[in-house]
């Protein structure tokens, strides 16, 4: 059996840059899957991607399928022949379906009996007869949200296809994909090198494309070169480039022959908040901003061209010419916005709906300011500042800058608040109200900002749940899952003394009679506890540990966190397994008993030494641990409770709980109930596996 390199390249018009990598990775994944299904052995699978091509190269692909041993089981021997030894209808029908006579069948003996069996070897087909179809199947599974059609063909793809190349070694694999016949033609760079050329062997790829076509097909090589060249360009002007990976990946997906240039803009534009300038550079123009060593934006930017220009100064001038009017617009918007304070813009919020049934943004900020003040009073933040920040939190949505650059909401509010002499804590809270915006994002930095961020998110959660617009499946138009997790992260990571029950109740009260969901508070709590479960699972906590804590239905997020940390630590202790098993036994005894345990232990009814010893330990710990539970020292409490392992083990070995004597039985149930109650002050450890 021989092996050859297999190459498939699909030449297209410019592919969407933000999805280029996911397209080619999926192509490689599904093609590998199809090769494996076809029993074609192969080596390493490598993918290549540029704006005008998707390619996959498979090393050491077997040129012939493996032979496959096929087995077809028939009826059991007992049903295959009658008492006289003659074949039954079931046996003859099975043999006919296999194309054999019954005497050609073998038998298969298993622990369940003996069966008729026919096995044969299916010879492998040549890879060249299979590959075109396997490529088609792989391409049909790519994650494409919107397909295009072109020309007279019925074929549809993310972009029009111009060339298809399928090579197994030096053999051209015939096939028609997207209406295009497979051929050896490879397209080069649009403006450099050879426009097209012939490839003779799969091993020539991608080097031949680099040499003849002036196309760097290796995505990671291109990405690394761009990053290195940008860093060098920034260093030449004493700057540090802002190279976010998302932008770097997008630019890598936009060019086939990257050439880095440095351009500049007028210093006067630096008077505009840097966030607006950076937004224009990165989001609109795909430029890389640069900063000085102090972190201040400099009047330069770095861009990546897709050509080795004959006139670099003209190319740089052209890009500077493009950015200048955009910056001039931003400067005009900014200066115009400064003429009106955030407070003066409040009435205009009455013209914007928050949600049809929940009223306008003006009504929302009235609620947010009140809830911010209430939260501030609970967590020790400045109440006056929190109320003011809540009131002004949405005013920047009515400014020219935010209308033009929506991503700067909050940021521009901070700048405008500072310009109009609002306290810095108020200004910062306006900016940080949206944090955390995504997983791993920063949290609000001050207690005032925490108050506003929690208030804004809780107002949205309460309102949308209140009109029964709950998230369903992957549909969450109001971002309620993100809002819930944001609230939980702030409370837990800032260790804030907030209770979800009272927080939600206050948010509900501020809505007046707008809400119609009668089960609102419980629904929101359950929803947020569900977010807890997902968050802590992703953080590596066992689902049984999470369930053990959730069984207590804690409504204080910081308290939940303390409990889960304590349980996670407890599981590492030698005594944990035995105590968990004993707790399950205690739980089963109590749940199955028809008797109702007494609230206290009658020491006069304790007869056996083992129950006397256990009761003494429980009563001592009950008294000792009371302040631990009040202070939330759950880990320390569990460290003390492990002392119950030995007396509990001895108790179960020497004492019968469900005795006929009712007084003794009820007293022993009370003893176990006391023990279980101690552990339940932390979590229900009977859930632990």
From Swiss-Prot:
Subunit composition and interactions: Tetramer of two alpha and two beta subunits.
Family stated for the protein in its record: Belongs to the class-II aminoacyl-tRNA synthetase family.
Family annotation (InterPro entries): DALR_anticod-bd, Gly-tRNA-synth_bsu, Gly-tRNA-synth_heterodimer
Reactions catalysed, as given in the entry: tRNA(Gly) + glycine + ATP = glycyl-tRNA(Gly) + AMP + diphosphate
Example GO BP: arginyl-tRNA aminoacylation
Name of the molecule in the record: Glycine--tRNA ligase beta subunit
Lineage: Bacteria, Pseudomonadati, Pseudomonadota, Gammaproteobacteria, Enterobacterales
Keyword line: Aminoacyl-tRNA synthetase, ATP-binding, Cytoplasm, Ligase, Nucleotide-binding, Protein biosynthesis
Compartment(s) where it occurs, according to its Swiss-Prot or TrEMBL record: Cytoplasm
Record organism: Hamiltonella defensa subsp. Acyrthosiphon pisum (strain 5AT)
Major localisation: cytoplasm
GO cellular component: cytosol
GO molecular function, one term: ATP binding
Domain of life where this protein originates: Bacteria
Enzyme Commission number: 6.1.1.14
Record-linked PANTHER family: GLYCINE--TRNA LIGASE, CHLOROPLASTIC_MITOCHONDRIAL 2 (PTHR30075:SF2), GLYCYL-TRNA SYNTHETASE (PTHR30075)
